[in-house]
Amino acid sequence: MKLTNNFSLEELTVSQTALRNGIDNTPSSEHIENLRLLCENILQPLREDYNLPLVVSSGYRSKKLAGLVGSKITSQHCSGCAADFTIPGVDNKKVFKHIVENLPMDQVILEYYTEENGGWIHVSYVPNGRGQALTKDKEGYKTW
């Protein structure tokens, strides 16, 4: 099922951990709608702004999958509102700043970024979001 021109439901729900452990990671219709909104408002605009594919490392997580990967069941991944991604060949700090300055995100986190290791970006969308920008490293979260 296509969510936008460049993003499919499968791309935002596939999980090797779920497959290896026999976990059903099928989202509800409400979660699918949240994923569609995330794609329409954040991921697809990024795809078009950079004219490069995004590699989604984590999208929707069922509560069972969240527990298995050490995530909280209150994570926005569990409601279909969040995704973790990179854009190969583009510095994650640059993408992070672009999101902060241009897109209607709820939360964006530049995770484990160093110049040697680009880390990844966590981004979430809900209508009328908080616009919260953070960084995260081994010592925890910091406001951007």
Regions found by a protein language model. Give the residues of each.
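Short connector loops at helix/strand junctions that flank enzyme active sites
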Residues: D49-N51, C78-A82
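A broad, low-specificity signal marking well-ordered, structured residues that form hydrophobic/aromatic
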Residues: L54, A83, I121
